[in-house]
């Protein structure tokens, strides 16, 4: 059996906390929070990981640098990692985007910069399409506007 790679951390990652997403269930979230004496208007980053990996595997080596400038929120998307939301029903990327909006509501964030890698880029774009008032900017890495439309693609 293959063992998944361990995430690499530079410094200390943001702590985990458990939040309850109404109608969705509990979710473990990495939240760097607002440090004491920091600018309350400091931008918030939502970090969306790629397909088949976890938030820590995708972003672990970047947490220290990012949290020095931004409030960082990261979690495992549905069906990913050991902390993602679990459901018996199939999910769509739109569900992941709506999960992100629910996370923002629960933690009291009105707007954020959505940062997505691979599948996470599609989730970031869907968050912007479905909840445009919540997205103040986007950074997309190794992503696409949409994925396969037909089996031939």
Predicted regions and their residues:
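N-terminal cap/lid segment of alpha/beta-hydrolase-fold proteins
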Residues: 5-26
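Conserved HGGG/HGGXW glycine-rich cap/lid loop of the alpha/beta-hydrolase fold
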Residues: 22-84
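Flexible "cap/lid" loop of the alpha/beta hydrolase fold
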Residues: 122-130, 134-153
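Conserved acidic catalytic loop of the alpha/beta-hydrolase fold
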Residues: 94-112
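Structural signature of beta-strand start/N-cap positions in the alpha/beta core
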Residues: 44, 71, 110-113, 134-137
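Active-site loop/turn elements of alpha/beta-hydrolase fold enzymes
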Residues: 77, 119, 143
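Conserved alpha/beta-hydrolase "nucleophile elbow" surrounding the catalytic nucleophile
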Residues: 49, 112, 116-118
């Amino acid at each position: 059996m293959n063992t998944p790679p361990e995430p690499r951390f530079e410094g200390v990652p943001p702590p985990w906390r458990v939040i309850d997403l109404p109608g969705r269930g509990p979710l473990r979230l990495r939240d760097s929070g607002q440090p004491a004496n920091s600018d309350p208007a400091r931008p918030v980053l939502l970090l969306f990981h790629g397909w088949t990996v976890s938030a820590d595997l995708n972003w672990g080596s970047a947490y220290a640098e990012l949290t020095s400038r931004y409030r960082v929120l990261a979690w495992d998307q549905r069906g990913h990692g050991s902390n993602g939301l679990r459901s018996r029903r199939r999910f769509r990327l739109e569900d992941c985007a709506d999960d992100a909006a629910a996370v923002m509501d629960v933690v009291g964030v009105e707007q954020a910069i959505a940062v997505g890698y691979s599948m996470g880029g599609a989730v970031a774009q869907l968050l912007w399409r479905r909840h445009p008032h919540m997205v103040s900017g986007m950074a997309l890495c190794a992503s696409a506007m949409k994925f396969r439309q037909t089996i031939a693609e």
